[in-house]
Amino acid sequence: MGCAASSQQTTATGGQPAAGEKANPAPANNNPNAANKAETTGAAEELTKESEPFVEPDPNYPDLSKHNNYLAESLTPSIYNKICNLRTLSGYSVDGCMQTGVDNPGHPFIKTVGLVAGDEECYDLFADLFDPTIDKRHNGYPRNAKHTTDLNPDHLKGGDDFDPKYVLSCRVRTGRCIRGYGLPPHCTRAERRDVEKVCKDALATLDGPLKGTYYPLTGMTEEMQDKLIADHFLFDKPVSPLLMSARMARDWPDGRGIWHNADKNFLVWINEEDHTRVISMETSGNMKNVFKRFCNGLNKVENALKAKGYEFSWNEHLGYVLTCPSNLGTGVRAGVHIKIPLFSKHAGFESILKHYRLQKRGTGGVDTASTDGTFDISNLDRLGTSEVQQVQSVVDGVKKLIELEKALEKGSDISGQIPRDPAIVRAEQVKEGYPDLSKHNNHLAHCLTYDIWKSLKDKKTPSGFTLDGCIQTGVMNPGHPHIMTVGMVAGDEESYDVFADIFDPVIDARHGGYPKDAVHVTNINHADLKGGDNLDPKYVLSCRVRTGRSIIGYSLPPHCTVEERAAVETITIGALDKFDGDLQGKYYPLEGMSDETQTQLIDDHFLFDKPVSPLLTAARMHRDWPQGRGIWHNENKNFLVWVNEEDHIRVISMEKDGNMRAVFKRFCEGLQKFEQMIKKDGKEFMWNKHLGYVLTCPSNLGTGLRAGVHVKLPLLSKYPRFDQILRALRLQKRGTGGVDTASTDGTFDISNLDRLGSSEVQQVQFVVDGVELLVQMEKKLEKGEDIFDILPQQCRPKPPIKPFSYDYPDFSLHNNWMSKCMTEEIYNKLCNLKTKGGVTLNDCIQTGIDNPGHPYIMTVGLVAGDEECYEVFAPLFDPVISARHGGYALDAKHPTNLNAAELKGGDDLDPEFVLSCRVRTGRCIRGLALPPCCTRAERAEVEKITTEALSTLSGPLKGKYYPLTGMTDEEQEKLIEDHFLFDKPVSPLLLCANMARDWPQGRGIWHNDEKNFLVWVNEEDHTRVISMEKSGNMKRVFERFCDGLKKVEDSIKSKGYQFMWNEHLGYVLTCPSNLGTGLRAGVHVKVPLLSQQKIFDSILDHMRLQKRGTGGVDTASTDGTFDISNSDRIGFSEVHLVQQLVDGVKLLVNLEKALMKGEDINSLLPEKLREDSS
C-alpha cells in the first residue's frame, strides 16, 4: 500500500516545490568515472555502509535539540527533506504527523513517541520516519519484520485461577480503526460521524451477554452523564498537550460516544484516540474469562463490519494500524489491579517485571503512583508478539507476583526466585567473552543471545574457523542508526552449518523471512528470460549482471591461508585460460602488476583496491594483499572476473546499452563454461538446496546476483512514491557512484532487491520488467500524464472512503459571531475552496467550532490563515466583520491616519487619576501566512524581517531583540519583572486556532533601551507593537507609537516587503476583531466613585469606550481602577480612536472629581445621557 497518488499529487506533490517554496538545484554529476564505480568499490553492499553525509536541512526542519522523544531520535535532515513535501491521498503531511512531538519536548525521564498518523497511508508514505521511530519505541522492530495476530482465547493457558485476595480486577483493551477513514488527528467531521454510525450499527448486532446500548456524548443528559461517571465509563475531552497538539479534540463532542453491554463488562469508546477503543473487564481474578469476552466481542464486531463492506486497518508488518505508533501490533493492554504491599517494596520487584515483560503504574491511570501497594500491572509489549502471547505474559507474571507476596507474608526467603540484575549478569557474561552489542545496529546484534553464543563459542569448523571469526566484523563495527548491516561473515562453507544457530536467524532477518526449511531455486538458463533486449537506450545507459562463486574445499577470504588463496587463483586462471571466442581473455595479477597495466585497468574501471572499509578489514579480508588477487577480462571487455576479492571469484557481465538479454546470456554462458572447466579438474562450486550458492557474506547467499541498469528517471524519481514503487517491483536504487551514493541528476543504478529464495532468471526478470515499467512511467510524466493506472497493483493504497455523513458543524450550543453568521448554504459554497497558500474554511472556523462561547461573552469564532482568506471566504468573513464591528458595510472604506500631530490634547491627563497610558496594534507582512497556518520557515522569515527592521531604529527608539528560543534565565526574569514577557498560548481559543505550534520557535520580544517601545514577534500576529509609559501623557505615547511604526514600515519597504493593508479592511490581521487599525489605546484610570454609578457603563458606551480590570482580558476591577480603551477598530482612523479615548478619559476624570466634591454630575454628562441620570 501507499504508492498511488491522484493526478493532482503527480504535479503538486511529486517532489516539486510547493507554492511559495524555492527549489534548490541539484549539483551536476561531473565525475566521468561515476558510471562504473559501482562494481569497483569492491565488497558487497552489506559490507560497505558508511555514515550519512551532511545534508542541508529544509527551512521548515524543526529544532528538536531540547527534545526527549522518539521523533527527535529518529528524524534527520535527509529524512525530512525527502518526505516534507509529500501528501497522503487524504492530504496529510509529515508535519501533521510530528507536530505533537515538536510542540511537546517531553520529560527527561519520560520518553514519549512524538508522532501520530493522520491516516493509514502515513505509515507507508512516511516510512522513512515512522520505521526508525517504531523500531526504537518497540525495542527493535525492523522494517521487514512480520507481526503475529492471535485472537483465539483457547490458546491462553491459565488465567482463571488468580487468587482474588490479591487480584482485584482484570481488564483487556485495544483499539481498532476502520480502513479508508482518516484517523482522529486528521479526520473530517463527516468521517468521524461515519465511523460513529458504522461502529454503532455493528455493535447493535451483538446479542446475548454482549447486547448493549450506545450513549452519544452529544446531547447527553446530566443524569446519564452522572451514571457513566459513577461507572467510570465516561471519557473526557482531551486536555493533554500531547493530544491537543495532535488535534484530537476538534469538534468535541461531535461523533463521540460510549457503548456498553448490559452487564457492563464489555465497553467500546467511539472516536476517542482511535476510531474505537474496545475494553473487556470485570471485578475478579478471572483473566481468562475477560480475554475470552474480549476476543469474542472483537471478532463479532469485525464480522459485522465485514458484512457491510468495511474492514479494520491491518497489515502483516504492523498488525492493527492505530493512531499512535506505541499501540501498533495488537494495541492490547492487559492489566490487573493487584495488591502486593510487601513484594512491591522488595528490591527484586523491578527484576520480576522486566523478566516477564511487564510494566506497573498506580491504579489511578497513566503516570500515577501506587500509595498502598496496589498496582496496575500490564504487558510491556504491543508489536511483534500476539494478543495471546501478551496476555500470557501478564498471566504468568501476575502468578509469580502473588507467589512471591505469599512467600513474604510467611517470612520466607525469596532471593533465589528473583532474576539477577541484568546489568550484573551482563557484566559477568562480558567477562566470559560474550560481546556487548547493546549499542549496535546490525542483524548480528539483533539475533545473537547469550545462550546462542555460549552454545557456539567453543565450536570450530573442520578448517578451524570459530564463532569469533564469524562475528568479529559485527562486533567491531556497531553500524549506523539508519543503515542495517549484517555483521557476520563465513570463514568456510561449514560455517553455515556449525554456527547455524546464529546464521539462520541472521539470514532470516536479512532476507525478509527465510525459514530454516526453505528451498532455494537455481536457474541460469538465459533462454527462460522474457524480453530484456529492447530496453529504451534513451533512458537505459548500461546493463550489468554480477555474482560470486566459491570453490568447495577451500576456506573463504576471511579465513583462507596463503596456500588456499594461491590454489583458488590457480584453479580460476586454469579454467579461464580455456575460454575461447568472445569469452577469450587475459589475467592480470595484482602482485607485480606494471604501472602500464595498472593505468589501463584504472582507465577501464576494472581495478579493485585493497579493502580499507573497517567492515572488511575487521573480517580480515585484507590479509597478505595483493597475494593471490587479480583481474581477468575478455578482449571485448564485457566479461570480467575478480579473483580473491570478497569471494573466491566475482563474475561480471556488462555493456553500455539497453540489452540486458545479451548481458545475461553472456553471464550465464560464461559461468556455465567456468563451472564445466573446474569440474573437469574435480572442483565444484559451494552450493546447497537451502542456501543456494554459498558466499562469504550472508547478504549474498542464494544467487549472489545483482542485475543492475543505469537508467535516467529525472521526473519519476521526484514522484512522491518512487521508493514504494521500487519496493513493490522488488527493486532497489542507488546513485551511479556505487554503494550509498545518491543520484544528482535523476540517473540511478536500479537492481534486484532479492538474492535468496528466487532464481537468477526470476531476479533478472524483475529488473527487466521493472525497468520497462519505470521507463514507461517516465515517458508518461514527460507528457504531463498521470501514472496512477500503471502503478503496481499491490502498492496502490485504498483511496479514502467518500463519507455518507454531512460535514456541516453542529452549532446548536454555540454563541459566537461565526456561528451566528454561518449557514449551510455558505458552508457548502466555501468548504471545498482553498487559498493559494492552502488555507481552508475549516482552518478558519475550527476555533469557533471548538469553543462554543459563553452565554454573556460573544467571541468572534473565526481567524484568517493568510491575507487571502478575507477574499476567498468573504461570504462568511463579511457578515462576521459587519456583526462584530457594529454594521461595517461591504463597500465601506477604512481611513488610516498615523499623524500624531493631529491629536488634540492628550498631554494633560491628570496623573492623580491616570496611572499609565498605552497604545498597541498589530502588523502582518504581506506574502507570509498568518500564525494559525504559517510554516516554521515563514515564522522564521517574519522574525528575520522584523528584527532587521527594528535594528535600524536609533535614538530613543534604539533597542535589543530577545528571542524566546535559548533565552537565559536572567533575561527571562528581567522581562517578567518588566511585564514584557508573553507566554505560550494556553487559551483554548488560541490553541484551537493552531497558534501555539512549534513554541517558542521564531518568537521573541524587542524593546528600546527606555523600555517604552515594545514589539512582540510572532505572537497572535506577525508583530504586536506597543508604546507605553507610566504617566498621563497619552500624546507622547501616541507620538512614539506613530514614529516607531513609520520607521519600521519604511525599513521593511526598503527590503521589498510591505504590511498587509487594503482600503476596505485597513491593516489585515489574524482575528477579524482587530481589522482596520488593530489599535487599542488604553489608560489605567482610577474612578472608584464614578464606577459605582449606574450610568457608568452608559457613559462608556456613549463615548465608544470599553472597560476591563487592570489584570487583562476578562478581569474585573477590585478597587475602582480600570483599563479603559477604545471600543472600535475599523471604520475610524488611529487619530480618531485615540482622540475618543483622550476626550472620554478627560470626561471620566472630571466626573470622578465632581463626585469626590459631592457635586451633581448631571450637567457634566453628554446631553444624550442627562435625562437618564435623574
UniProtKB/Swiss-Prot annotation:
Which GO cellular component terms are attached?
Answer: cytoplasm; cytoskeleton; extracellular space; motile cilium
Query: Subcellular localization, per the record?
Result: Cytoplasm, Cytoskeleton, Flagellum axoneme
Top-level taxon of the source organism: Eukaryota
Q: Which UniProt keywords apply?
A: ATP-binding, Cell projection, Cilium, Cilium biogenesis/degradation, Cytoplasm, Cytoskeleton, Flagellum, Kinase, Nucleotide-binding, Repeat, Transferase
Record's comment describing the protein's domains: Contains three complete but non-identical creatine kinase segments flanked by unique regions.
Q: Disulfide bond as a keyword?
A: no
This protein's assembly is summarised as: Monomer.
Q: Where is the Phosphagen kinase N-terminal domain?
A: 53-139, 426-512, 800-886
- Protein's recorded name: Creatine kinase, flagellar
Q: What is its main location?
A: cytoplasm
Name the family the entry cites.
Belongs to the ATP:guanido phosphotransferase family.
Please report the stretch or stretches of sequence annotated as the Phosphagen kinase C-terminal domain.
166-408, 539-781, 913-1155
Q: Name one GO biological process term.
A: cell projection organization
Which segments carry the region annotation Disordered? 1-62
Q: Which organism was this protein described from? A: Strongylocentrotus purpuratus (Purple sea urchin)
Q: Does the keyword Lyase apply?
A: no
Q: Which residues bind ATP?
A: 169-173, 232, 277, 333-337, 542-546, 605, 706, 734-739, 749
Q: What is its EC number?
A: 2.7.3.2
InterPro entries assigned to the protein according to its UniProt record, in alphabetical order: ATP-guanido_PTrfase, ATP-guanido_PTrfase_AS, ATP-guanido_PTrfase_cat, ATP-guanido_PTrfase_N, ATP-guanido_PTrfase_N_sf, Gln_synth/guanido_kin_cat_dom
General function of this protein: This axonemal protein participates in an energy shuttle that utilizes phosphocreatine to transfer the energy from ATP generated by the mitochondrion in the sperm head to dynein in the distal portions of the flagellum.
